[in-house]
Amino acid sequence: MEFNGKVAIATGAASGMGLLFSQNFAALGGNVVMCDVSEEVLLKSVEEINAKNQGKAIGVLCDVSDYNQVCAVRDRAVEEFGRIDIMVNFAGGTAVRMRQVDTNIYPEFPDVPIDVYDWGIDVNLKGPFYFAHACLKQMRKQNSGLIINIGSITGAEGATLGMDYATSKAGLMYGLTKSLAQYGAPYNVRCVCVSPGPVLTRAAMATMKTLVGRAGEPQEIVDLILFIASSKGQFINGENIMIDGGRNAMGRWK
């Protein structure tokens, strides 16, 4: 696969799968606009990518829940590279974990302060919604593009304490992705959701069961995203693709 001259925006790109995608995309010749709220880590990652890859990376500080900042990322991408070919919404996380909520003090869903869940909905659902709204203006103009949402097995399974995460991911997987694919079709814009099961971005994921008997490697998820974005993946549109080692098929065997 090659992405020479292609332009991607990746949120949550200072670490995890967002960073891994950015590294892969640049290594394959693509230019990438990396967004994150962690400025120091982001700029270091950008510098490392630019030191050893064909493609160019730029870093833009962005809170995905702030629409004005989202539009600024879009504008910077167009100013720097002239177009936006791919938009990948990596930024997200379970609010209770990301906000370091003490579950001994707040043990159940109704006990957790609502502002914690507001953060989760803002980042996990409104963020991708905002980026789609902003980037589609450019993609419509250029009559091409791809939006990739990152869902989760949690969107299909539910989560008693992480309801913000499960609700948001389900919204991406089944509502936003299909709606964007329907809207984008006349403009040659696709939308696909990639929904991982347990992936070894955190040690805790190793204990989750799958039919293949292991958690996924981050590179396996990124490889699927790259395939969808490549010339070989052009017939994939409007779908939520589970990449979960068969976890969603386990049913009562979990």
List the predicted regions and their residue ranges.
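Alpha-helical segment proximal to the catalytic Tyr-Lys
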Residues: K137, A181-Y183, Q234
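Short, small/polar-rich loop/turn modules that mediate ligand/substrate recognition or access, typified
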Residues: A185-R190, I236-G238
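Canonical Rossmann dinucleotide-binding motif of NAD(H)/NADP(H)-dependent dehydrogenases/reductases
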Residues: E2-V33
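Short C-terminal tail/terminal secondary-structure segment
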Residues: E157, N237-K254
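Conserved mid-core segment of classical short-chain dehydrogenase/reductases
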Residues: T94-D118, K141, L161-D164, W253
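Catalytic Tyr-X3-Lys loop
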Residues: Y106-F129, S144, I148, L172-M173, ...
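Residue(s) in the substrate-gating loop at a strand-loop-helix junction
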Residues: S152
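A short, exposed helix-loop element centered on a Lys and neighboring polar residues
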Residues: A132-H133, K178
